[in-house]
Amino acid sequence: MRKIKNMMMVGATEKHAGKTSFTTAVIKDLKKKYPETVIVALKITILWEGKHSVSGYRITNETDMGSVKDTGRMLTAGADKVLWLRCDEFNVEKGIEQLLSEMPENGVVICESNSARNYIEPGLFIMVRKSDEGTLKTTALSVMDFPHIEIRSSMNGHSVEYNPDIAEKILVEGNRFKVDF
């Protein structure tokens, strides 16, 4: 397992739990507090055999600030670089190694993924859980013992709400994440 101290990973218990809403709030807050810090945002999607037709791995660099995709939202929030790794279950480690080779030595990494937690030990792992919880994603079940922090969110129409003070409590010291509770 690869240890990456300057990475904060965000997972979610189910779809539409507010993972990207939380991630973008953290990016915005970190850019205000640490304008000189390089922030790289990652989305890692592992495609399981039989469910998708992708083989190998592919890394996409998001450049469209107008995109409504999660990666576009991260770029709009202030990330300096946004990469999306899509890989099949047989090429996860190879894809992650290639992705990490493109990371800056200085700065911080914010990664959205449940499954990648089985391959990467981040400095901080946060799980976003819906208050009106439905069925947990299989990928969430496999990493439920790992989160340092669990955040509850609730749906309000089509938007997700959570306590915004939580994003403000995430700090960076020496390119490492710290939580001020």
Give the predicted meaning of each segment:
Residues 9-26:
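Glycine-rich phosphate-binding P-loop
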Residues 26-87:
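N-terminal phosphate/diphosphate-binding loop that engages ATP/GTP or pyrophosphate donors
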Residues 2, 41, 66-68, 76-77, ...:
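C-terminal accessory "lid"/substrate-recognition subdomains
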Residues 5, 36-37, 79, 104-107:
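Short, high-confidence coil segments that cap the C-terminus of an alpha-helix
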Residues 9-10, 41, 83-86, 109-112, ...:
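General beta-strand structural signal in soluble alpha/beta enzymes
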Residues 101, 105-108, 113-181:
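Conserved catalytic-core segment of NTP-binding enzymes
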